[in-house]
Amino acid sequence: MNTARTARRARLPLIISALVVATAAVIIPLSQTATASAHTTTRAAATAGFKPTIVLEHGAWADTSSWNGVITRLQADGYTVYAPPNPLQGLTYDSAFLADFLHSISGPIVLVGHSYGGAVITNAATGDSQVKALVYVDAFAPAQGQTLAQLLASVPGSCAVPANLNVVPFPGAPAGVGDAYITQSAFPSCMADGLPAREAHVLAVTQPPIATSAITDPSRVPAWQTIPSWAVGGRRRPRHTAGSAAGHGGERRRPHH
């Protein structure tokens, strides 16, 4: 669950490359459907209006502004882009929230998730015929029945451990559920490694919390079983394999967590 800003600044070219490949995989079949006998290039198909909508889902302890660099590049290339807020209220709730948002979009969608956002897109896109591709950016891609707690425990080195968390109750929370913050002392190294110290400390103060149910809710039938998937992985973070998650990746063959 590393910070989106650090991950994206370091790997923006890789993210854009993965999105280009994923969108090309959507564009080409669409152009072939529209003009079955024509030999169109990806660029020609895109120019003709076949570009999919790209939806970006941020991860834990972050907000939609963490996608700003990616959004700027995609908009410059003529894509329609949405970065809806992730409520961070638990995997079940957050997935339903995103699924409803996706239903408001007409036409094909390339759905992108970072870190915890990968688990959300894994659940939200299941059964949605408009989602044509998934892109995982240093992200979780749990199998059915898995929890993020299980995945985090499977590989040592995660920062999301009790010693680094401040869990605060909130009104109406189910028993045992609270809002988790990364402690301000741990945040710079855990979530903002590579950022200037001043910016890291500001992010520590302004971080949105995530409900602890995000890591305890079991994942449902994964969308990556039926939707083509690509992964952009971080080299410095622990990765957690989701067994049968099939996909494409510049750094690995599967979506990671």
Regions found by a protein language model. Name each.
Residues L134, W230-R237:
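Conserved strand-to-loop "acid loop" that flanks and positions the catalytic carboxylate
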